[in-house]
Every structure is written in structure tokens, then in C-alpha cells.
Amino acid sequence: MATKTFSLPFLLIVCIFSQLSSTFGDPSVKDLGQHAGYFSLPRSKSARLFHFFFQSRNNSSDPVVIWLSGGPGCSSSNQRYISYLKISNLIYVDQPIRTGFSYANDSTDLRHDEDSVSNDLYDFLQAFFKEHPNLAKDDFYITGESYAGHYIPALASRVHNGNEKKEGIVINLKVTDISLVTATATWSAG
């Protein structure tokens, strides 16, 4: 496993900048509503999906959007669609397992098809909305790029089926068609 090392001068500069930023009233990471972390998956032995979550800069009741990247195996966390934050709460997920910072210690947790990936993402969303219950009632959109065109309809179907069967927290899914998902990604981001 590769580790990153930083020089002492670099770390001092970061600490000084952080202190100056808070001294002069610049927003902190907490103020900006940014969260990152892992959720474990109940259908796995040891898998953890990593995510970044950015709260809307406009209104906490703005829609929740999950951004999926393609590849397969491309991390969603390298995307920087800041304009989305003006109109939505945005989730990036490193998926499938062993992409980006997501990991598993058991090879049986690796996924090789859209159904398995969509089950993992559904479990992720259940954990996410359990941690953020105030967002569960908000409109929910699935979007992405490239190979995510395979995952988007699979996840939309999984969410729809989970809602119908009352398997957990009801997710207020607003898009169930891949063509509509593509259109959603281009709605006015101001």
C-alpha cells in the first residue's frame, strides 16, 4: 500500500493558512457543509464505500444528487462540479468496491455486474439517509458520466423496487429513465 508523506514546511503552511482563514472569517470545512467518510455494506463481509457529501450552498431542502463516474473503476471523487452545489446536495461515491478510497478485505465482496453494484449503492443510500434523515424527504436524482450509464438505470430500478417493497427508508426518486437522467445533469446550474 502506498503512503503519502508531506514535508514539515508544507504541513506548517497548511496549519498557518487554516488558522488565518478562520481568524479572518473565511468559512471552515464544517461551515461549508462538507463531509467525507465510509459506510459499511450489510451484504458484504468487509466492504466500505467511501463518499464525499457537499451540502447545497442555497437551501438544505434542495434536491439530493448522487454523481456516479464511469470506468468502470473511476473514482467519483475527482469530479468538481461546484455549480451543482448552488442547486443541490451532492454525493460522490467511490464505486464499485475497490475504486478510489472504497475498499474490501475479502475478494468475495468484489462486484462484477450492475445488479451487485446497484445493491451496494442502495445499501449505501440507506445508510446515508439514516445518517442524514432531514434529506430523505428531498427529491433524489441519479446522474453521472461514461460507464455510469450502466449503473444509473440499475440503481434507479433498485431504488424503485426498494421503495415499492418498503425495504427501508423511502428514497424520493425523481428519475427512472436514463435519457431523463442525462437531461437532469444539464438543468440550470446558474
Curated annotation (Swiss-Prot):
> Where does the UniProt entry say this protein principally localizes?
secreted
**InterPro entries the UniProt entry points to:** AB_hydrolase_fold, Peptidase_S10, Ser_caboxypep_ser_AS
Q: Which PANTHER family match?
A: SERINE CARBOXYPEPTIDASE-LIKE 48, SERINE PROTEASE FAMILY S10 SERINE CARBOXYPEPTIDASE
Q: What is the lineage of its organism?
A: Eukaryota, Viridiplantae, Streptophyta, Embryophyta, Tracheophyta
Q: Which GO terms describe its biological process?
A: proteolysis
Segments traversing the membrane = none
CC annotations in GO: extracellular region
Q: Would you identify the family this protein belongs to, as annotated?
A: Belongs to the peptidase S10 family.
Q: Which SUPFAM superfamilies match?
A: alpha/beta-Hydrolases (SSF53474)
Protein keywords: Glycoprotein, Secreted, Signal
Pfam families linked? Peptidase_S10
Does Secreted show up as a keyword for this record? yes
Q: Which residues are glycosylated?
A: 58-59, 105
Task: Return the protein name.
Answer: Putative serine carboxypeptidase-like 54
GO MF, one annotated term: serine-type carboxypeptidase activity
Q: Which residues form the signal peptide?
A: 1-25
| Localisation | Secreted
